[in-house]
Amino acid sequence: DGSGGDRELHSYTYLTDSYAAGGMWERSEEFDNEQHRWDITLPLTPELGESVNQAYFFHPGQGYGEGDPRHQSRHAQILPDRGVVMALYPIPEDEDSTIVGVLPKGEWIREERALFGLACGVYLAVYLRHSYEAEEAEDRLNVRSAGEFGGVVIEAAGLEEAESLDADDLAGFAELMRGRAPVFAADGRGVSYRSLQSRRLE
């Protein structure tokens, strides 16, 4: 039921020298639901400036206000694995299907259903099931994507990992990742993806 209650909650964290990725397998109902369920976190360095140091998406729930990236709903299924987080949003028909995302400031290549970025020495590939709108804010890139059974897959890679795959800059990383786009099920209830570490995720 997504309420959490007294049941045990399980978290997943993957740490590298460049970033951390992870999330909560289960959602816990908490006061105001201010916590997001998963994220990729970059190191706090002077290079970031005033930018946020996290990348995450969620479906807004009760208490959400425009521009305030908190207060998620209970409609999310996630699979974190190493530097990848996959999330599906099975939102009921009577609710707004828009999911919102927060990305760190950096250099971004925007495509119809994907964004490829470089922020604080970390490459990020962001794939969405539906098209999106992205707006630059003072400290972040705000993303909105609407459509039934939305989904997102994010993979992070450090500079050395990307270079080992012959991606020497953001353009090279984007070229590498374009051909690795996840396959979302026609009904939106599943997704498959092969990570940069050749792990098949479904």
Language-model features: where?
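Ser/Thr/Asn(+Pro)-rich, low-complexity disordered segments
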Residues: 2-202
